[in-house]
UniProtKB/Swiss-Prot annotation:
Glycosylation (residues): N467
CC annotations in GO: extracellular region
Pfam families linked: CBM39, Glyco_hydro_16
Protein name: Beta-1,3-glucan-binding protein
Upper lineage: Eukaryota, Metazoa, Ecdysozoa, Arthropoda, Hexapoda
Domain of life: Eukaryota
Keyword match GTP-binding: no
Protein's job: Involved in the recognition of invading microorganisms. Binds specifically to beta-1,3-glucan and activates the phenoloxidase cascade.
Domain CBM39, residue spans: 19-123
Example GO molecular function: hydrolase activity, hydrolyzing O-glycosyl compounds
Keywords on record: Glycoprotein, Immunity, Innate immunity, Secreted, Signal
Keyword Secreted: yes
Record InterPro entries: BGBP_N (IPR031756), BGBP_N_sf (IPR043030), ConA-like_dom_sf (IPR013320), GH16 (IPR000757), GH16_GRP_C (IPR035806), Glycosyl_Hydrlase_16 (IPR050546)
Length: 481
């Protein structure tokens, strides 16, 4: 009898203890802005929102609005799009999804076929919505990695999970700085580019304001005081250092011709937080202007499975030197190694007829496929990259590549066949600029005194730096193929 009672209790608990997706609160603001949120509950690990305006969803498609929210704020899991413009009478069709951990397993719970009719636009003052959220409909739990019916499988993966074709898998509009998505680097720059930079988190180098990310390079002496770069004492960035502890990324001591980096800047990435393989990346940004400054809009390998540095490749979404004689030339593509030939072999470029790429905002686009990479700017294709017969490894001798034998174990597109993460930053100097014979470049790349020589030429390059010497990023989007 006792066993029977226990069995009945467990059955009742299992039947009636099923998780229910919380009601979604929909708020539409004037003149623009859309916020959809659910209350936080213990066990919720992810909230996803997918929606369209005045168009019904085709099953669980990605939709016009599509985002995974990875962290609750102020007691709610919140999707917010500051640019969404809706009017009274519009209908928002949507579905939501929650990853829920019950103490043993993480299961996915969708809430399908929802709609919200806009009856009133709200001021951005936290006013209550005029329409009661729709009643939740129970749905059986599903594993998050299982593709739903009506979903066409994509070759794209995000964080090693399969996704639906055409789905928007990442969207950042910098409403706030999301530390659960972005990791600010705190380190001294080192290989493979040896830029003359000390990466810091926070002002004056890193700011998120007015829905834009701004990264600005600033001379180190202006931040820490005159003579900072050559003071004879050890500088240890631990425990905040994001580089390899104990290495020159975290600890440096000036002496003789060795100085600390003469420029402070910032670099953020989704390393360890979010990654993907294959897809369309779109970044709307204004590039920095000024001598020896360049944008760092990259895709870097997550695990460096083919080896350290460029042995595992890098995809450059947009690169343009800030010098007057370089800023008309936009370059993007695949970096195969640190030598000039390997840096240029799989890179495409487009030259602006007038003005520079840093004069205004542009859309920089990369379409990364298993056998091809397409480079675009403002929806114009300026290059396609294909692997040679035998793969990139077949060019090892011609390009003076080292430590690339592991590529033979990958696809013909190796090393560009592994998950990568996003990088946004600003670099200065280093090996990204080829040596010149006309003495207009104040250092040579293999000179151990290169950083000091750059610093000694500060009056020359500093005169070209201005308020335009900053990278401004409006948004970052990634969509599945």
């Amino acid at each position: 009898m006792k066993v029977l009672v226990v069995f009945i209790f467990c059955l009742v608990r299992s039947t009636f203890g099923q998780f229910e997706v919380p009601d979604a609160l929909v708020e539409v603001f004037r003149p623009r802005g859309l916020r959809v949120s659910i209350p936080d509950q213990e066990g919720i690990k992810l909230f996803a929102f997918h929606g369209k305006i005045n168009e019904e969803m085709n099953g669980r498609e990605g939709g016009t609005f599509s985002r995974d929210i990875l962290k609750a704020k102020n007691g709610r899991w919140t999707f917010y799009d500051a640019n969404a413009r809706l009017k009274e009478g519009d209908i928002l069709y949507y579905w939501t999804y929650v990853d829920y951990f019950d103490g043993k397993n993480k299961l996915g719970y969708p809430n399908d076929d929802q709609k919200f009719v806009v009856k009133q636009l709200l001021d951005k003052d936290g006013a209550a919505p005029s329409v009661t959220p729709p009643t939740v409909t129970k749905a059986p739990p599903q594993e998050h990695t299982t593709l739903e019916s009506g979903c066409k499988a994509s070759v794209t993966t995000k964080v090693n999970e399969r996704v639906c074709a055409g789905e928007q898998i990442f969207h950042e509009d910098f409403t706030t700085f999301e530390t659960n998505i972005w990791r600010p680097e705190v380190k001294f720059a080192d290989k493979p580019d040896y830029e003359f930079v000390f990466y810091r988190a926070g002002p004056p180098n890193l700011q998120v304001k007015h829905h834009r990310l701004t990264i600005r390079p600033v001379p180190s002496d202006a931040v820490f005081g005159e003579g900072f770069v050559s003071r004879r004492e050890k500088v240890n960035l631990a425990p905040a250092c994001t580089g390899v502890h104990g290495s020159i990324e975290c600890v440096q001591t000036p002496g003789a011709f060795l100085i600390l980096p003469p420029v402070t800047s910032a670099q953020i990435s989704t390393k360890g937080k979010w990654s993907f393989k294959y897809g369309k990346v779109e970044i709307r940004a204004k590039l920095p202007k000024g001598d020896w400054i360049y944008p760092e809009l990259y895709l870097n390998p997550v695990n460096e499975e083919y080896g350290p540095g460029y042995a595992s490749g890098q995809i450059r979404i947009a690169f343009s030197g800030g010098n007057e004689d370089l800023c008309r030339d936009l370059r993007g593509g695949c970096i195969l190694g640190s030598r000039p030939a390997a840096r240029n072999y799989a890179v495409k470029n487009i030259v602006k007829n007038s003005g520079s790429w840093s004069d205004d905002f542009h859309k920089f686009i990369v379409i990364w496929k298993p056998d091809q990479i397409t480079m675009m700017v403002d929806d114009q294709v300026y290059g396609n990259i294909y692997p040679p017969e035998g793969g990139f490894v077949s060019e090892a001798y011609n390009l003076d590549l080292v430590n690339v034998e592991r590529w033979r174990g990958g696809t013909s597109f190796a090393p560009f066949d592994k998950e990568m993460y996003l990088v946004l930053g600003v670099g200065v100097g280093g090996h990204c600029f080829e040596d010149r014979s006309d003495a207009t470049k104040p250092w040579t790349n293999n000179d151990p005194k290169s950083q000091k020589k750059f610093y000694q030429a500060a009056a020359q390059w500093g005169a070209t730096w201005s308020n335009a010497s900053r990278l401004e990023v409006d948004y970052v989007k990634v969509s599945a193929l």
